Curated annotation (Swiss-Prot):
Record's subcellular location: Secreted
Temperature notes for this entry: Optimum temperature is 30-40 degrees Celsius.
Keyword entries, A-Z: Disulfide bond, Glycoprotein, Hydrolase, Hypotensive agent, Protease, Secreted, Serine protease, Toxin
The protein's name: Kallikrein-like enzyme LV-Ka
Length: 194
């Protein structure tokens, strides 16, 4: 997260750092005591041959995020967090996750920066119009939290991160809630929405 600060230790209890054999890979979000969302592995299994639900070791320090009961409202102040780089043009990974407040933007504001982006992509745009606060490389899979609910999953955005007029793009969790609940319940045959 660029333009943010170190997260308070109690506010990132659902945020995880995912490592592979070569080191840090990306952020992820805990959505129940056993299921971890990693952006490419959980929300888009149709695009991958290997649908992974990663095992989580329970502890009193882990608190999953609530799935949304309704979509977020444009203008909402939302919280982003992640283990990604904290500098926009070079990779500077922090020792603790960083957080920032950004605003949920109208689709029209998003279309200015991203002509190919539309409602059919089941996404949300959030950021600060003047730039300076944004998720960045390594934050993918982390949460966009609005009113205490897990509304978005960090997906993609501009390079360099935090560029004015180019907000971050997030997978809209509300559109996948029924499918996520089916997967959590053990229904591996559930079909991911297009």
């Amino acid at each position: 997260v660029v333009g943010g600060d170190e997260c308070n230790i109690n506010e990132h209890r659902s945020l995880v750092a995912i490592f592979v054999s070569t080191g840090f890979f990306c952020s992820g979000t805990l959505i129940n005591q056993e299921v971890l969302n990693q952006e490419d592995k959980f929300i888009c299994p149709n695009x991958k041959k290997n649908n992974e639900v990663l095992d989580v070791t329970n502890s009193e320090n882990i608190v999953p995020l609530s799935l949304p009961s309704s979509p977020p409202s444009v203008g909402s102040v939302c919280r982003i967090m992640g283990w990604g780089t904290i500098t926009p043009e070079k990779k500077t990974y922090p020792n603790v996750p960083h957080c920032a407040n950004i605003n949920l933007l109208d689709d029209a504001e998003c279309h200015v920066g991203y002509e190919r982006q539309g409602k059919e992509y089941r996404t949300l745009c959030a950021g600060v119009v003047q730039g300076g606060k944004d998720t960045c490389q390594g934050d993918s899979g982390g949460p966009l939290i609005c009113n205490g609910q897990f509304q978005g999953i960090v997906s993609w955005g501009p390079h360099p991160c935090g560029h004015p007029g180019e907000p971050g793009v997030y997978t809209k969790v509300f559109d996948y809630t029924e499918w996520i609940q089916s997967i959590i319940a053990g229904n591996t045959a559930a079909t991911c929405p297009p």
